[in-house]
């Protein structure tokens, strides 16, 4: 950081500089604005990480890569311009940028991995046709995310009902508070709705077979969930950290119900109601496991 002067929170990197070093401005709390010249071709890993006062940045077209943790936990960053010259955005590049309101992912970027985790002010995201890999937690804890769009010519992903799905529609990769899970989904991926705190209820359609690890974890306002007949497995902590009060199970035989201990790890099931089909009410109400719930409720109509 000693290479460059900061005046009233603003740093203008001189023309001719070609590189911003690894962690060069890391934890610089006086930095509010950075001006990067078009002679810079390389930004080092973690170059601006934890610059909590940094509010805006424009990346010049000379840059082709935003590296790992480049703007990690820049909690005041509201605006960032990423030019179409950028082809790589590294893991956790914008993680924790809680005030970042919008961002454009350039065509050419192929891989996203925890890139925008905990960007709590991000309202919509557009995924270009070039993106072929989206890692777990890439958009987790984006609590205000309401719209998900994927370019129609993307060969791997598509968007339906504000969900990001694989092209064949079988795997739900990630969703948001306004998601409607479409018919045809077989798998809800690990961390698909993780920390989606504005999600209050969700309908899992018939046909879903697998509900992944932490898929609805820490959705603290989620109050109800349904388990369709098709579900074969609900894995570790799938609904931990929620406010679920009611579970709707569409299975006639309680012994065929997927294990609910691990998915609800950390939650007290004796505070939850389980709603079951009318014809199976007796079996559930006398079943040793389901007796542990607050109440077994007879449903005369399908949830």
Task: For each feature predicted by the language model, list its residue ranges.
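Structural signature of tandem-repeat unit edges
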Residues: 2-19, 29-42, 52-65, 75-88, ...
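Consensus positions within tandem repeat domains that build extended binding/scaffold surfaces
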Residues: 22-24, 45-49, 67-72, 90-95, ...
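A structural signal for leucine-rich repeat
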Residues: 117, 140, 239-240, 261-267, ...
């Amino acid at each position: 950081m000693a290479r460059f002067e900061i005046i009233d929170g603003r740093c203008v990197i001189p023309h001719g500089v070609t590189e911003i070093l690894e962690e060069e401005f890391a934890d610089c709390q006086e930095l509010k604005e950075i001006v990067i010249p078009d002679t810079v071709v390389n930004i080092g890993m973690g170059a601006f990480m934890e610059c909590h006062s940094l509010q805006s940045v424009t990346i010049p077209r000379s840059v082709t890569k935003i590296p790992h943790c480049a703007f990690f936990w820049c909690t005041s960053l509201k605006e960032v311009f990423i030019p179409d010259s950028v082809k790589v955005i590294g893991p956790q590049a914008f993680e924790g940028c809680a005030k970042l309101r919008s961002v454009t992912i350039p065509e050419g970027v192929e891989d996203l991995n925890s890139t925008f985790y905990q960007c709590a002010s991000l309202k919509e995201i557009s995924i270009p046709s070039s993106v072929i890999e989206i890692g777990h937690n890439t958009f987790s804890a984006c609590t205000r995310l309401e719209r998900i769009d994927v370019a129609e010519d993307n060969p791997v992903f598509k968007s339906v009902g504000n969900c990001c799905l694989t092209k064949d529609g079988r795997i739900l990769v990630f969703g948001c508070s306004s998601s409607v899970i479409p018919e045809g989904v077989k798998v809800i991926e690990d961390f698909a709705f993780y920390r989606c705190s504005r999600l209050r209820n969700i309908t899992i359609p018939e046909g879903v077979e697998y509900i992944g690890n932490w898929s609805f974890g820490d959705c603290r306002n989620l109050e109800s969930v349904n388990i369709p007949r098709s579900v074969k497995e609900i894995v570790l902590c799938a609904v931990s950290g929620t406010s679920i009060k009611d579970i709707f199970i569409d299975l006639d035989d309680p012994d065929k119900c997927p294990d609910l201990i691990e998915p609800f790890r950390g939650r007290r099931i004796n505070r939850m109601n389980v709603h079951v089909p009318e014809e199976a009410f007796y079996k559930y109400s006398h079943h040793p496991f389901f007796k542990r719930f607050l109440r077994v409720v007879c449903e005369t109509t399908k949830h």
